[in-house]
Amino acid sequence: MSDLNVYQPWSVPLLHTSLSDNFIQKLIQLTDVIAEDKEEQESIGSEVSGEIKDEWKIDPVLLTNIKFTDNIIRLGWEYFKIVLNNFQIIDNKVPLALVVFKSALENIEISSAWFNDQKDNEYSPMHKHTGILSGVLYLMIPEYLPSRKNKDTDGAITFIGNETAQEGMISNSTLKISPKVGDIFMFPSSLKHEVYPFRTKDGKGVRRSLSFNLNTDKFIPQAKWFLKSKITSENIPLEE
């Protein structure tokens, strides 16, 4: 992976990095096989919000076989370290919220994955995912026609945080990014986002992106206990 970039115009981080060309090619080959065998594949279109025709499930086992899952879990730990650095740690004691997050990561897995072949004028309205962490990776991007109004939003993904009127003076609740092939973004599953449509010269352009959710069954009861007890911190030492 290349250098990590962190975008945080609101309170939760959005992690951005890129995968190697070799890895991207493996994922393109995998998704090509699925796309070419549509009659035997399971569409995820009814389960996600996108106004996109071709959206297909990926068995997480297939991603494990090509070591994609290992890379994503490592990225999840990088995300944890970023969050940890944003917390105030006093006397080497970790807030309970991070203890819960760390426990989740120790047992986390890709709970669902899918890809879509987005075509001209298709889009995905504002939505959020299920799970703990989610991500999107870009495998193929066509050449877009210029925007009619020069706003450079065609084909962009926009992340949307929470903002009050006062916060708006010193922060920005939205972040618009025009992704490139190989770009991968990781974010809390609750972070809302939307995808703009685009146009291509022949009207046959395809942008392929792969999305995934990370979750663990062992995280849920701990999270409920934490919220129910209303405990805001607990003295648990950091592990070496």
What are these regions (language model features)?
Residues 211-240:
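Double-stranded beta-helix
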Residues 108-186, 196, 202-206, 210-216, ...:
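Catalytic core of non-heme Fe(II) oxygenases with the double-stranded beta-helix
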